[in-house]
């Protein structure tokens, strides 16, 4: 069988698609996967490293843009649709999975025109515009959070959880070694592109953390733009910190961490949940429909995490929460146990089962 995974742009969209691709390929050595994305998205940098084939199309967002930009985006959508039809006719997939992001729309629309089975996966509590539209023509909608069900057709919506990569699941099963010298390990990241506000808050927090720096090991994914300045700041303050623009092996980073400071995107929540890590969530305030805050609140209701809203974020506030977790290991353990209950280990298997359960003829020339 052949599968196309369409979408990306950010790790939050791409990583669930990679997880499904891994499971699909593991089922049969003859299976094939093709990703379709854009040259601007994280997929263009990451997928070649992982050995996946990627085709890029033209696509852009429409929501929240100026009238002129909307016209240009609509033109790109039409061009992307034409590109997608050509790719689908050449690859001849059995199924198409849209994972959100700009590239998802023209590909799934093309799949409908070519009568190819098509599915979409929604990662967040509040769906994006692309998936809300595509749900009308999808054979089935897979959701990660029960709260999002009300936005989709009831008879074609299925709660699966958020698919996770095999390396994440493997590290969960392996556990981790004890920290050297009794130091606690803090992982800080703001998504695949970093988060400037989290970066600046950590710089502001360093003076407040000075009294505990001998007992703290920090791994910080900064993104490309802030990497140089962040590296200098940690060095000048005398912290034991690994500062990197991008962490290729997030599974190892999760496994090594004792607690985490991060955003509250759906894929991040799914990964930290199965990893069983206490987290200080700092939701991205400009996410569509404030969905990151809604994602985090679902965990806070069950004492499965901590949250600092960005409008309340200061170096002092962040440092205070970090020090609290360092000083209260029982609280860290309790929170980790609670968040682990949200982990769904079989999401990728369930999705692949559903997509391959009813095989349709290969795409034919239209």
From Swiss-Prot:
InterPro entries: GlcNAc_MurG, Glyco_trans_28_C, GlycoTrans_28_N. It is found in: Cell inner membrane. GO terms for molecular function: UDP-N-acetyl-D-glucosamine:N-acetylmuramoyl-L-alanyl-D-glutamyl-meso-2,6-diaminopimelyl-D-alanyl-D-alanine-diphosphoundecaprenol 4-beta-N-acetylglucosaminlytransferase activity; undecaprenyldiphospho-muramoylpentapeptide beta-N-acetylglucosaminyltransferase activity. Keywords: Cell cycle, Cell division, Cell inner membrane, Cell membrane, Cell shape, Cell wall biogenesis/degradation, Glycosyltransferase, Membrane, Peptidoglycan synthesis, Transferase. It holds the Pfam family Glyco_transf_28. The keyword Transcription does not apply. It comes from the Bacteria. It is an enzyme of class 2 (transferase). UDP-N-acetyl-alpha-D-glucosamine binds at residues 10-12, 124, 165, 192, 247, 292. One of its GO terms (biological process) is regulation of cell shape. Cell wall formation. Catalyzes the transfer of a GlcNAc subunit on undecaprenyl-pyrophosphoryl-MurNAc-pentapeptide (lipid intermediate I) to form undecaprenyl-pyrophosphoryl-MurNAc-(pentapeptide)GlcNAc (lipid intermediate II). NCBIfam families: murG. This is UDP-N-acetylglucosamine--N-acetylmuramyl-(pentapeptide) pyrophosphoryl-undecaprenol N-acetylglucosamine transferase.
């Amino acid at each position: 069988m052949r599968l196309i995974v369409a979408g990306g742009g950010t790790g939050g969209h791409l990583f669930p698609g990679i997880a499904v691709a891994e499971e699909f390929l593991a089922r049969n050595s003859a299976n094939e996967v093709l990703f379709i994305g854009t040259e601007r998205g994280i997929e263009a940098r990451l997928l070649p490293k992982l050995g996946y084939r990627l085709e890029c199309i033209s696509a852009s967002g429409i929501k929240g843009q100026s009238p002129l930009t909307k016209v240009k985006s609509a033109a790109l959508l039409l061009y992307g649709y034409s590109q997608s039809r050509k790719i689908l006719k050449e690859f001849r997939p059995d199924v198409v999975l849209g994972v959100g992001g700009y590239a998802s729309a023209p590909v799934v629309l093309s799949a409908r025109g070519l009568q190819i089975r098509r599915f979409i996966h929604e990662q967040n509590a509040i769906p994006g515009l692309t998936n809300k539209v595509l749900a009308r023509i999808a054979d089935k909608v897979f959701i990660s959070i029960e709260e999002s069900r009300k936005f989709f057709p009831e008879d074609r919506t299925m709660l699966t959880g958020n698919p996770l990569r095999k390396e994440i699941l493997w590290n969960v099963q392996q556990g981790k070694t004890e920290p050297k010298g009794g130091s606690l390990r803090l992982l800080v990241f703001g998504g695949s592109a970093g988060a400037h506000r989290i970066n600046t808050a950590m710089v502001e927090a360093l003076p407040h953390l000075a009294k505990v720096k001998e007992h703290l090991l920090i791994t910080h994914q900064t993104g490309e733009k802030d990497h140089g300045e962040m590296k200098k700041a940690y060095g000048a303050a005398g912290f034991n910190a690994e500062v990197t623009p991008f962490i290729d092996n997030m599974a190892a980073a999760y496994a090594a961490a004792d607690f985490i400071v991060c955003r509250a995107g759906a894929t991040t929540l799914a990964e930290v949940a199965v990893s069983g890590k206490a987290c200080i969530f700092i939701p991205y305030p400009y996410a569509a429909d404030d969905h990151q805050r809604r994602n985090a609140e679902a965990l806070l209701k069950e004492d499965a995490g901590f949250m600092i809203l960005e409008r309340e974020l200061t170096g002092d506030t962040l440092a205070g929460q970090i020090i609290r977790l360092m000083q209260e290991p029982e609280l860290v353990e309790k929170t980790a146990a609670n968040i682990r209950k949200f982990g769904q280990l079989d999401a990728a298997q369930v999705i692949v089962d559903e997509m391959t359960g009813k095989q349709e003829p290969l795409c034919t020339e239209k």
